[in-house]
Amino acid sequence: MKKSLAILGGAGAIGRALTKAALSENWHVTVLDLRKTVDTYPVPEGADVKYIDLFDEQLMASTVEALGNLNGFVNAAGFTSSMKPIQNIELDEINEVIQGNLVGAFTVTKLILPKLKAKQGAIVNIASGLAQYPRPNFGPYSAAKAGLISLTKTLALEVAPDIRVNAVAPSAIDTDFIRGGAGRNKADQLDIDFKMVSEMTPLKRAATTEDIVGPIMFLLSDASQYMTGQVLWVNGGSYMP
């Protein structure tokens, strides 16, 4: 029998790569994402799609209600806005980033827990290295991802032993989502020097989506059945917690 996986933000670069990998391992995959994002970045053939918006509580509830029971849930949704020091950021910008990276994930996770408990499933949250090692001009995003890690650990305690909850925290990946969130903001908002990132990384390259997919699939699998409340830092050795 196929295992069932829902991917929040599944039309993003990490989500599409994860969908492809999960389909190749005979998972039934449902992508949850904005209609505009799915139209712009079609998901791999074989995946189901349900539309969701992390700024629409009613739509979140109805979309999750329509799902069947799940073996896995991956929260790959998220975006950052333009790079600014905190003193130059307006409150509405902060609220948008916190909602899209933390509050929305909190809401969908809360709604989806009964679907996972029925099959003793696993949750994987996609955090960020900026949660542990912040950099200037990423204040709201760093705070949101740090909150997501705290949420991961708290939830792991609360839902054990029925559901495992872990996180993957990657370094910078050259995707549309790190450049503003496909479907919500412009994809060229941020100017990140990936050549410099590569030079500063012991493995001498920036991360790819495939680098992130492997650890996610591991945390969804029975190979990690004794892991919960943990964070896998996937960063090429650029920082070592």
Language-model segment annotations:
Residues 89, 134-142, 154, 181:
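Active-site loop-to-helix junction immediately N-terminal to the catalytic Tyr of the SDR YXXXK motif
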Residues 109, 144, 152:
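Active-site helix of classical SDR
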Residues 114, 156-161, 225:
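Alpha-helical segment proximal to the catalytic Tyr-Lys
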Residues 76-82, 237:
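Conserved NAD(P)H cofactor-binding loop of Rossmann-fold oxidoreductase domains
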Residues 217, 228-241:
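Short C-terminal tail/terminal secondary-structure segment
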Residues 84-86, 90-98, 197:
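Substrate-binding pocket helix/loop in short-chain dehydrogenase/reductase
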Residues 128:
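Residue(s) in the substrate-gating loop at a strand-loop-helix junction
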